[in-house]
Amino acid sequence: PMSDFAYPLHEECGVFGIYDRAGTEDVAAAAYSALYALQHRGQESCGIAVNDDGVIQGHRDLGLVNEVFTPAVLGSLSTPTAHMATGHVRYATAGSRVRANAQPMIVRHGRGTMALCHNGNLTNALELRRQLENEGAIFHGSSDTEVICYLITRNRLRMGSIETAISKTMDVLEGAYSLVIMSATKLIAVRDPRGYRPLCIGTLPGGGYVFASESCALDAAGATLLRDVEPGEIVIADTKTGELRSIKDHCGRPDTQMCVFEFIYFSRPDSIIEGSSVHEARKQ
């Protein structure tokens, strides 16, 4: 029902992405470990999508990480040729406890496939959704994440790259969003211009990058914290070059403000956010 959509109180979700440049990691297992470390950010549903040589497939369901990802399910996602993965844990109101709202959301379109994970809350989601529905869009769930997916996909069909499509989409999004997006050849982290929800970058010992809501997930995946994604920044790990690059068209807003509850309540004490230990911040 629309009422669920109008008040999607999934403030506290966890997102994760991994690109293993060396090809030595079991990326599905790394995603599982990371989501287990982020379980405190959402207990309603979870999911993992893997990129196996450009082919994206995934599994998502209602339940805790260790319930949804049995050894058999995790095994079906673990292949030696999969070098990228994304994962998500979701927290939401009871009314929208449906599998259609579980993430990562996988979208197949004329230019390829995209898997998207979202932590945050759009303030203009209802307005955007109605606008899209009036133009013929069909939605399967009640989450604002689906609106983001639709907008990026529509822009991608008109534009030269997924990152330009994301930047164009950011022009109309209002509110909080930290995104991890996986295409056939790229893993991308996006943070809203106000930086309301945390998002950090880590490096893998064998080469490659990890994106996560909190640094505790980097630790779980065997990565080292590099830095936070800046408010408004789009960070691209490109498998064709193996390097990180950044688009800062939406950076530089003077009113950046991270949610105070990240330090007080949401985040794990052993995480480091914006250079500060959550544990130390709570003691203060």
Question: How would you label these PLM feature ranges?
Answer:
Residues 1-284:
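Conserved short alpha-helical segments that host acidic/polar catalytic motifs at enzyme active sites
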